[in-house]
């Protein structure tokens, strides 16, 4: 065993370059790079060669510091390499997760610093969801998912390829300070200051178990509670546990989640546990679960590290006072021979073992063999809670379509919205929404693994580096707004996100006097300037008053609309970071600026259609303009705007206080009074359990549609002044209704279906449950198509409903439907409230079509015969007049 503490691995602050805390450390899967995150807001990547080899350290041609990344605006609390080595995830107390990728063509001097980047790791995207410090990160073993935890008491699950949000878990009641994945793939474990470890089932993200006994008396003073899962999936080692007055690491057994065993010996709280990724087997014995053992490293606030085998009652080695302050993080190299640690004192250590010391260490094939014994096959499809574009199809007026969109908003940053996917297997970019009619194009890449193999050494480009270069270029295009197919619900951009746009300059007609010209920015960087100056007061937030996440002020917002005759229309808001500067709103059409205006405060959201454009500012003001630049509406809202969406002449506004408004811009009137969606997002009396908005749109008839991560879809019913459910996930064990024709409701159905967790629950034995479910689904769809003003879909579901009623002999229900369609048979002295038309079609014409379907069913013939007679008599009476 050899212990190395390189004094040149450091994070520094101030003019005197004083060493500062290194909160997290992670070694690359190929063992050549070490990533560190510190109090200086920076992420640094170091070469491990001069750390592990004294002779190599002396040679100047061996670089030590490979790259410094400084996009975070807060302390970097967690750094984690993906197992394939292509991505580095970092979490910070700026509430942001950054995903970094290697640009093989990069390098050079770091801006504002003397540091030279040998490699150029750039931010591919930023993940926004946490509203407090991001404390820990973990990649699933197959890298299909990334988990993050933070001081907002939430756990976020992200897609490991597209980085869309899959799920938010919010059952912890305290800061969540540690996370790890089950190597088998069945579970996720999280540890919190609420003195529990929670086990989550990855099939449906239900809570499988809560373990609290070992932590009942544990102190809440630790910065982290980093736990680790053994490579054979048999145990979890949880930090900061207590056994009476003794500081221990608790061992949680996978079988029954018992926690009777613990590792004892440290003199202060244990902050981090880290299992060696390799398994150990006695020589000469068959390799399997029964003979496998594992190695565990523990780091504590007594400034020491201990290394254990689960088959022994005492540690293999204890390194006392290896640091001068609390230990923050530990990680093992993939070969199992090197353990790295970091500390608040600003130093790192490398503990290197020789193969002769670990004679029973096995290769990864043995681990695979053990994990296969669990015979676990994931039933879930790793699909994100897809967010639909609000770009309206010309054919149906709602949601994405293969036809030309009515409008497309680009680079209007909103949390939890549609993202473009990058297919890293072939370099293709799918720019459409992540669910809906075009979903087929967004499936995961074929089985050939684009991430196989490590990133090669520094000396010469390799095939792996070329693959990384292509990945970096693809991701650059995907995370920038190079296409006009990203909707106004696209996610917030990173600290810096490059974008490009082409503006045609066709022959222009003669117009009158225009405004001073500013050119649209062809290449630009979107930067987070600051938080809004006006935000909901935390003191106002409580069980009955919860707020949506507030947006950040960005340097540039851009929205695009594609109108008739392929006219190119852009709206661009340019926010200034200079207190004395001006915030400018520019409108471009056909490749040139038509007008501009100065905003009173920085813009938080913009949207544009062929009929109007709108900008919401951080002072709560909302300004709506005509295409010629007339200020049509200038309103002061009750709160900051969370989202803006436009459709035809309708403007949808969602504010941070969960209020939804729809305004008819053409006549300047509200579609209905403001309505709250608080009860849709924060059900019950507690705001700790909440749902997210994964899609929000407005129909041309003014009806807003909200889809939540429950998942449920709601449309506002102006006649009731309430939200009506128009789509819900299927019931376990019952076959859902076949899909209907394309239209707004079918788009909503697809989002909800793909957002619903996969369940293996058996069908209920309750009597008539299937019939009840089928009829309620038909009836919900009928109401939904009326609210969404979808004539073709309504006809399809009405005829299907009547056929089902006839086949199953539900004569009374069929009779009620016919009575509503045909209306009063005789003249009524008092108004009955019966409307003769439905979706613009005469109800009695609809009745005739319905009767044709009903008459062809075995049980519905008699009902149809009665109503045929009524309809014929009414037609005869009308003819006699």
From Swiss-Prot:
It comes from the Eukaryota. GO terms for molecular function: nucleosome binding. Belongs to the WD repeat HIR1 family. This is Protein HIR1. Disulfide bonds: none annotated. The keyword Transcription regulation applies. Residues 398-409, 459-468 have a biased composition (Polar residues). Its main location: nucleus. SUPFAM superfamilies: WD40 repeat-like. The keyword ATP-binding does not apply. Required for replication-independent chromatin assembly and for the periodic repression of histone gene transcription during the cell cycle.
